[in-house]
Amino acid sequence: IQTVFNPVNIGKNPRFVSVIPARKVDLYGRVALHKGRDNVISGPMELIDSFLGAQISKNGRVIFGLPSRNMDKKPNFKLSIEKFHNQFGFEESIDMVVTEYGVAMLNGLSIRERAMALIEIAHPDDRNELFEQAKEEKILYPDQIFMLESSRLYPLEIDKTVSFKGGLSIRFRPIKSSDEEQMRRLFYRFSDESIYYRYFHSLHIMPHSKMQEYLNVNWKNTMSIVGLVGEPGLGIIISEARYLVDSSGESAEIAIIVDEKYNGLSPKYLRF
């Protein structure tokens, strides 16, 4: 045990991934740990050693996994787990939380961004209550929008990494409500000319109210795919392609925006 769970030895292995079973997660990103007989990690010290080893490891990751609900069909995602025992005390260092509904990349996010990312991977029947609780506690903006029906239709199966010439790899996935800050940064990287051609009028700011309306997609008639570069959880959005089917259902409007640093990507979107 002392050899296997030595964080220095673990850290010598590049890309070491520590997968830790969780019992509960709250919207602040805090985790209550799961304890069971079948765990490889037998105690809290081994867990901390595994965690520290992943932190030391080059490109290492710490992933917490849990089902969205327990065996009694009660939610494992809470507004707060402050009163739960066996809490993990390094929530700022958690890279990912995984459920059967997706992955929340938490690295470097604010509390508000964490809350939105975690709500997106909670059980669909629990999301609206979590959202309203987060607004009441002022974790989210008072005017924050959340389209419950659209969240149920999120096309989780669309997720693909494509390699391009020059060693460039881009991950394509559907846009999320929690992409607000990333999409705002992308907007401010555009020239005035690019903004005009995309939105057909001049825009100098992209406030929260306007951006969140754009991000809350009605998946029944709209598709929005973003492209990300960089390590998972640390990547940045460099592009978005969107189509909107008209009311007749016979035609659609298509718009593609690409970070000017990556000009030439638009034709790849059409093939994707």
Show which residues each predicted segment covers.
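Conserved phosphate- and dinucleotide-binding cores of soluble alpha/beta proteins
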Residues: 1-145
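Long, contiguous binding/interaction regions
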Residues: 151-272
